[in-house]
């Protein structure tokens, strides 16, 4: 709200991730984002950069935990010699974070992890984290918003009231009443229950505004303006394609640029200039010109690599 008050509101109000139903909602601890998954890269200059921020549905932590477990088995001496900070407590810390937003008076809140289902690419992580925290893994069809406005999970013993939902479903698919009306993975009435504090949702609906890559471009300025500090880790230079000068620079140096949709994640919709044919370049420029707010551009970065076993040999693979 401070950012909107002090600067042009259009950056927020025109974002694909802006949700009007979040306006005036008051949350416990006044905290909207409880989990942040920023993508870090190591560039050719040897420095680390933040490539993008993920606050809507951050994913990937289970792979970090599994990787650390394997590394400790294979190279235990490295962890002993260099005092590497342990990460084993992550599931416990995550559970404590979820429990802290409980709006009920229960000392042992009922917490569930809401997954899109077995066909989601991150389903392994959903089941892993639910198991590690000792909470139920549920799909939308397992939950119901009753007449009293509270959320319940269906069990063989009957309905059990849910206090906190760790959602791994995008905003638009959480509730057919407030997003995609055809969603089959959400829960009808869930957003209203959240607005009325009858259930807590982590991360809160509306956090996608912080995922917006056009908003990302302003994060260093936000840090300097509001915290009076310099960012510890720098952002990648980002060109806003609503700006005519930025557009001209990007189009004139297309081969050195990466074009990204502001609301996508996981590499979806990205165009790498050097890999484009003439027709692909022209098609990308047309898309940008039709909706400049929907795209940003960044210079192509040479990412660090790690040896990866491909089935026959070790090959370099880029890291982020």
Functional labels for PLM-detected ranges:
Residues 2-4:
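Short, small-residue-biased leader/transition segments that mark boundaries at the very start
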Residues 13-18, 125, 130, 152-163, ...:
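Active-site nucleotide/adenylate-binding loops and adjacent lid/helix of ATP-dependent enzymes
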Residues 22-57, 320:
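Conserved metal-phosphate-binding beta-hairpin within the catalytic cores
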Residues 37-41, 150-156:
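Short acidic loop-to-beta-strand element that houses the catalytic metal-binding Asp/Glu
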Residues 47-85, 179-193, 275-287, 315-319:
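Extended active-site and interfacial segments that coordinate phosphate-rich ligands
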Residues 58-130, 194-198, 209, 213-215, ...:
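Conserved catalytic alpha/beta cores of large enzymes that bind or transform nucleotide phosphates
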Residues 141-146:
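A conserved short coil-to-beta-strand element within the FAD-binding core of flavoproteins
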Residues 301-313, 317:
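Flexible, glycine-rich loop/tail regions that form catalytic "lids" or insertion modules at the edges
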